[in-house]
Amino acid sequence: MSTEIQTELHQAVELRRNFAIISHPDAGKTTLTEKLLLYGGAIHEAGAVKARRAQRKATSDWMAMEQQRGISITSTVLQFEYQNCQINLLDTPGHQDFSEDTYRTLAAADNAVMLIDVAKGLEPQTRKLFEVCKLRGLPIFTFINKLDRPGREPLELLDEIEQELGLQTYAVNWPIGMGDRFKGVFDRHKQQIHLFERSAHGSKEARDTTVELGDPRIEELLEEDLYYQLKNDLELLEGVGPELDLDLVHQGKMTPVFFGSAMTNFGVELFLKYFLDYALKPGVHISSVGEVPPTYPEFSGFVFKLQANMDPKHRDRVAFIRVCTGKFEKDMTVNHARTGKIVRLSRPQKLFAQERESIDVAYPGDVIGLNNPGVFAIGDTIYTGQKLEYEGIPYFSPELFATLRNPNPSKFKQFQKGISELREEGAVQIMYSNDEAKRDPIMAAVGQLQFEVVQFRLQNEYGVETILELLPYSVARWVEGGWEALNKVGRIFNTTTVKDSMNRPVLLFRNEWNCQQLQGDHPELKLSAIAPVFSSQTVE
């Protein structure tokens, strides 16, 4: 590798940060996302989703159904710069039905920000997504939100994180007051108090007054009880809390904790500054040829998301690629690991929610959008140089099933196209009956809202009205060894056999008990709750 390329890659990696936000619905994730963009200069005024004023729609919620309902239901990539760093924010769906899309997004992230509502603490969806982050070994940064409202004691929340998630905590800053009396935060590293001034509904950057801890003005600026509460809390933290250990943070064993209010912008910029200092830069990825560092000179990346109709005017399809190694250049030709084909990557785009602009180069940690004329599938690896392939992205086991009918024969082509494209982008899993007379697709989902999204998008983007009929199943299991293994067993009971989009056998059960009964009757039949990951090479 030439010295120039090595230096270029090293500098690019040093200046990149990549993260996803995980939270329970309504913890304020879309609001925090907007405020980070506000401080990054990517937008000039934040528009809260739930605000009843005539503010504009939230930047990250771009799909028609998201803007109607005020919830995030598809992951979005938002890229912006702050203090010379290139930041890739992978905005994930907040709704619990969309854990599959979130999982795929976390596969492309280097860090995770866990957002917690100060009044509610840890909630079910947060715990579930934390487990995914833990499996991937992601560093987790915690932002405790909504301090402008009444909530639980900060020390109680730290204890809950430690006890329930097994994470050590280190409070990087500490709140002064709460609810109507929330005045600001104390920066433990710099020993400074930041007192905030409210901006117009939080749509502009918050102004703050910074005061050193020993400054005699503190007692004038703070009410007496808040000042003494702060002193007592800090003494307790220094006495019993651990020191910040970035090695433990990067191993996912300690979480730096920040307090603030995304709605009013209090504490958001402080969080962003420390995040850039503490977060992992783009690192090594496990591949079929072992660990590959980001400064490896050959280009490689993987597809973690597909999205149809991001621009309804053009009926386009975009593949989201996480760059892992080397330098991406416009019009370069790459190898497509799954098919062995050579693909020319023309018209690459920098993504910003629904908006896009052309780019010429990209580096490890970046996410680029490529027009996808049916070439890419989720989990695909593209590369130059020596053949390599990254680990695939598995599917979650669905729990809800329904047949989807198109009552209008004249819309057959649009129906087939819509189902195919929505399946490819992972909006829902599609299965088919083994009975050739039953041609209607079977949708398989993690939650009910996925069905609603598919029906809405088929009508909104493809002009097809559909009829949904729920099926009485709640458990799906893939057969290891495929049709050959299943046929050896012979006739089986209390299950329905279907095939997935890759023609692999899947057994559907009404309940977990029926599934366990089958496994007891046929121990030779190996069943899996996760679809086998297709890969032309195994990972060493």
UniProtKB/Swiss-Prot annotation:
InterPro entries, per database record: EF-G-like_DII, EFG_III/V, G_TR_CS, P-loop_NTPase, PrfC, RF3_C, RF3_dom_3_sf, RF3_GTP-bd
Binding site for GTP: 23-30, 91-95, 145-148
A Pfam family this chain is assigned to: GTP_EFTU
Predominant localisation class: cytoplasm
Entry superkingdom: Bacteria
Keyword Isomerase annotated: no
Domain tr-type G per the UniProt entry, residue ranges: 14-283
Sequence similarity: Belongs to the TRAFAC class translation factor GTPase superfamily. Classic translation factor GTPase family. PrfC subfamily.
Name this polypeptide is given: Peptide chain release factor 3
Gene: prfC
